Amino acid sequence: MIKENLFFEWVDKNNKKLKLKWKILILLLSLLLFIFSFYSLFQPINYGSTRIFTKNLKELFTFSNYSKKYPSWTLWQLSWYYMFLTIRYCALGTTLGFIFAFFTSFVSSNFQKYKFIRYIINIIIIFFKAFPISLFVYFFSIGFDKELAATLILFWFSWLWMHKYFLDFLNNLDKTNYKIMHMKTNENFASFRKTLFPYIVNKYFMFFVYSLESNIRWTTIINAAGVIGIGLLLNDARDFSLGWSVVGIPLLVILVTIIFFEFLTLFLNKVILNIKNINYQNTSFLWIKLNFRRIFKWFFVLFFVGLNIYSIIKISSFTLYPNYIKNFWNHFFSFQNEVFSHNKENNPFYWILILIYQCIVSITIIAIISLVFSILGNEKLNNVTQWIPLRFLNTLFRIIPTIIFIYLFSIFWIGTNIFLLVAVITALRKSTSLVKQLNESINSINWEIYKTLEIQGKSKFQRIIKFVFPSIKKDYLSFLLFYFENQVQTLILLGSVGGSLLGSKISIVGQAGERTENILELMTYSWISWVFIAIIQLLQFYFNLIVQNKKISQLYLIKNLNTYFTKIKVIFKNKFSSDQ
């Protein structure tokens, strides 16, 4: 029997479904909100810039090997020099972040018996993760020498973001064997290492490779903020005296490098880590294949150990600037009300409002594009001629640095803001990453049920609506929540190129210098960002509970708080009784 209330209907109370009329209403409201946000950000296009745009695009493909900015270098030499420099500090920063994230996620996961420690570590990480990335880009840039600063920025970013991935992964593991061994040994890490780690090491292996590839692409954004790396050569596109001809070779070097890592990831995932369909009768082949995997993984680990040692040796200077570091932390909790006014340009509520508009436009584009492309580009849902072109376009758009699209198209909005342009471009770029993740989710569904529906005569559209989408719905919503927070950070970070009003405020003050008044103003803007991002994290946490069909009251922390308050009441009651 179907039960219902005003909003939901259900047969099983743990599996409630929103009524169709409310779904339609939510979709209509979302559409209206998107249109209103888009209109609020819209700036007229300067079609007179079409000639300049065409000229820049043509120059991009001339691949000039000389730049008057670097007379002693050819651009091929300089591009590969900066590319190897970027790979070095990305490898070292990602490795350090990976190691830290592994241990902090383990200590703060369900494997940690001391729940107080779990909460303390998670609160610390959530606290720092809510700050805009640009704040710590500034901190490391003023406190450490160039290459060391770049390494620490990558470490910081990798640690905070990988911690969440690892924590979610660990908390969702089947712990049956672990619990049995833990009961015998009473050792957390040893039990984990012997019962679970051998089965999840491949997952961590791929986590590392994905993170390294992602960080190499991400460096072009922090390079726009002045951090050393290959992206500095892309910034020359903003210099009209140099032109776009000097950008072609650095861009090509970046694309070649990222394509190499794409193929490496594919090779590791499909060949090295995939051991299905081994013919056990052919013992010689079996030995070669199993040992090849083991040898390759050890070679990979040793190679990166060697690369990290080499990266440390090649860091040109380990110079620290203690006065700047001390000054930064001394004013970390500062907040200046006097920097604000009722003028829109200096009103923090207006900055946040613009950021909200950008996020609404972005997340709507991400939601639609990623879902459509993941379904149309899935190899199991479509034939080869359909999914290969879409997969190619998705990969091509994903490997081209975001900053190139912003520099190229911003010519149409000279003299006005580019908030809408940046929101759309970054949303399209993030859609390509989400397509990849959703494609993996689609490949993991129960395809026997899909085939049964096909035999029953259901159309392809019906099979997708009735089975495929419901099967990936939880993953889809969880991904969108994650990308919402990630998009806020990206928009603030791209303030260095005018990507957001709040980000521009942080960038301008950050580039002004290391004076105390600049740090005070920077911290004020950063705390505004912190409050906004922290609210998003709380909403993300709450909506994740809804997606997972959990109740707030089921959480351990809430239950224990209730227990503690009850105990305190009993203590006071007993004390009051004894006093009488």
UniProtKB/Swiss-Prot annotation:
Gene3D superfamilies tied to this protein: MetI-like
Domain of life: Bacteria
The UniProt record lists the keyword Nucleus: no
PROSITE patterns per UniProt: ABC_TM1
Transmembrane segments: 22-42, 83-103, 120-140, 150-170, 214-234, 247-267, 295-315, 349-369, 403-423, 464-484, 490-510, 527-547
Compartments reported by the entry: Cell membrane
Keywords: Cell membrane, Membrane, Repeat, Transmembrane, Transmembrane helix, Transport
BP term (GO), one: transmembrane transport
Domain ABC transmembrane type-1: 83-265, 352-540
Primary location: membrane
Topological category with respect to the lipid bilayer: Multi-pass membrane protein
InterPro entries xrefs: MetI-like (IPR000515), MetI-like_sf (IPR035906)
Family: Belongs to the binding-protein-dependent transport system permease family.
Function as written in the Swiss-Prot or TrEMBL entry: Probably part of a high-affinity transport system.
Protein name per the record: ABC transport system permease protein p69
Organism: Mesomycoplasma hyorhinis (Mycoplasma hyorhinis)
Species lineage: Bacteria, Bacillati, Mycoplasmatota, Mycoplasmoidales, Metamycoplasmataceae
